[in-house]
Each structure stands twice: as C-alpha cells, then as structure tokens.
Amino acid sequence: MIRIAIDAMGGDFGAEPIISGVIEALKEAEFKAVLVGDSNAIKPLIPQPYLKNIEFIEATEVISMSDGATDALKRKDSTIYKAVELLKEKEVDAVVSAGHSGATMSLATLRVGRLKNVSRPAIATLMPNSKETATLVLDVGANVDCRSEHLFQFAIMGEAYAKEILGRKEPKVGLLSNGEEESKGNEVSKEAFKLVSRLDSFVGNAEGNQIFDGSIDVMVCDGFMGNILLKTSEGVADAIGKIIKKQVKKSPLAMAGSVLMRKVFKTLKKQVSYDEYGGAPLLGVNGCVIISHGKSNSKAIKNAIFQAIKFANSNINKVIEEELSHFAR
C-alpha cells in the first residue's frame, strides 16, 4: 500500500483543511496517510472509521512563511523536516506539503537528494488551457537564476512527466520567450534553444499565450519568469471572476442570464481553479514531493494526494534518469 507523509500543520489555515482533504482522499483511494504534526490537535479532527488508515508522527514546530528556507535545515522537529526525513529513509513513498515551499524544496534537495545527472530540481505546475488538457509549466519558482543546461534538463523532465503522468504520447515542448523566432530571447534562452533542439519533442520558442491556447504541452522557463507567470495568471483569473460578478449585479437581465449559465460558470471555475490540480511536483529529486498552495482547501489537498499516488506508482524518476543519461557529458 502506498504510504504518503502529509505535513498536517503547514498550510495557511492550519490543520483543519488538510485533515479534511486527507479524509476525502481516503474515501476514494486506498493508501496509508502518515500525518506529521501535533497529534493532540490532529486526532480530534479525524472520524474514528478512518484512523485505521492513518499513522501519526509527532512534530512540534511549523516552518512559517516568514522563516528563511535554510532555517528548515536546523529545525529538525518541524513538520516538513520530519516528513522529508521519512521519504529519505524510504518509510513513505511520497510527501505532500502546503507549507513553506522554499523549505520543502531545500529539504527535499539536500536530504532526499537529486536524481542522477540532475543539476537542479524544478517545480512543475499545470495551467489551464482552452483545449481543456492543461499545460505543464516548469520551473515556477525553484530556481531564480538558471543556465542554459538547467533549462535543457527542465525540458527533459517536463517531457517525461507529460508522457508518464499526463499520458501525452507525443508532447510538444516549448521554450518561453518574447517571440517564436530562434533569434528571440536573452543569451541564456538562446543557448538553451540550441540544447533543447536536440529533443524531437521541441517545437521551438513559444510565447506566453501558447500556454493557454493548448498549442504546446510543456512550457520551459526559469523559476523567476515562471513564478511571475503563475502569480499573474492567478491574479487575472481572480480579477475576471470579480468583474463578472460586479457586472452581473448591475443588471436584472444579466442576473437572470447568469442563472441560466450557472452550469457554464461552474465548469469554468473548475477548469481554472488550482484546487483541481492539487499541487506541483518537485521534479528531479530522488522521490515524490508534491508542493501545494499555502491557501489549499480540502479539495486541493485531496487532489495533491491523488497526484502523489499516481507519481509514486509510476516510473517517472527512472525515465528522467534514463533520458538524461543519453545527454550526459
């Protein structure tokens, strides 16, 4: 049975939405949940019938968002440190955390280690597109500064994830740039273009709008650009939702129409909500680490757990190592 360590205290809203997400996941999937945190605070939130599929690991500290990522290495009694340590010792198959993403990434990289030939792990996230297939974008925050070879490795890892986890037989990989021409981009991206061109899946430079029109499956960029892209798209989606609500309230006719379009709005909200994707895998580490949004609700945690189960049951890390070995110097 798959064993998943879950940082039970790391989210912005405490343990309640995390535990609710675990319970929802246990209703639909068979796995062992290893909850890391204060059991005295966690146990009262769990209905008796689910306790048989839950284990508790005591941890008294929580890494807050105001703490530095490197502080986590010294806080050995923190929830995320203990969760990652369980993965390192192979006592669990995956880790899910909605806590400090920088701390999670640092601990996973330094304690669990990187896959062979991986220089830097990358955070990969799914973003909605008009074809309803979702586009994988990486890196979205793990590496602010990248060299061309790092972007090349991200492309290989993203392609492998698209094939093994998303089921895309022939994924199209693009390099995020300010134009499709080979001459576009900065010096790093131009050099990366030459390297990524060795992949049959590479379709060339791609502009930001192609993430959302579904014309590519994997978009590669550095973590600085990727994180801005992610946060901007979240902000735009939120703003559009608020604008629609305001405009609907201004007109009785619009309000009547919104009732008729309720199903459409519900489908749209579902498609653009991060709750549906659950979390972002940290690709390139020697294990399965899913980083969830700090504001994750129970549905997001449930889907992050499902994502971890699928990852843990796959050969994704083996595939990444094999693909990278073909290009190792």
From Swiss-Prot:
Could you tell me which pathway this protein works in? Lipid metabolism; phospholipid metabolism
A molecular function (GO) held by this record is: phosphate:acyl-[acyl carrier protein] acyltransferase activity
Which EC numbers does the record give?
A: 2.3.1.274
- Where is the protein situated, by its record's location annotation? Cytoplasm
Which reaction(s) does its UniProt entry say it catalyses? a fatty acyl-[ACP] + phosphate = an acyl phosphate + holo-[ACP]
Residue ranges annotated as coiled coil are: none
Q: What is its main location?
A: cytoplasm
Q: Which domain of life is it from?
A: Bacteria
Any one biological process term the GO annotation gives: phospholipid biosynthetic process
Quick one: a GO cellular component term?
Answer: cytoplasm
- Print the keywords alphabetically: Cytoplasm, Lipid biosynthesis, Lipid metabolism, Phospholipid biosynthesis, Phospholipid metabolism, Transferase
Q: Assembly and interactions?
A: Homodimer. Probably interacts with PlsY.
Q: What family name appears in the similarity comment?
A: Belongs to the PlsX family.
State its role: Catalyzes the reversible formation of acyl-phosphate (acyl-PO(4)) from acyl-[acyl-carrier-protein] (acyl-ACP). This enzyme utilizes acyl-ACP as fatty acyl donor, but not acyl-CoA.
- The name this protein goes by in its record: Phosphate acyltransferase
Classification of source organism: Bacteria, Pseudomonadati, Campylobacterota, Epsilonproteobacteria, Campylobacterales
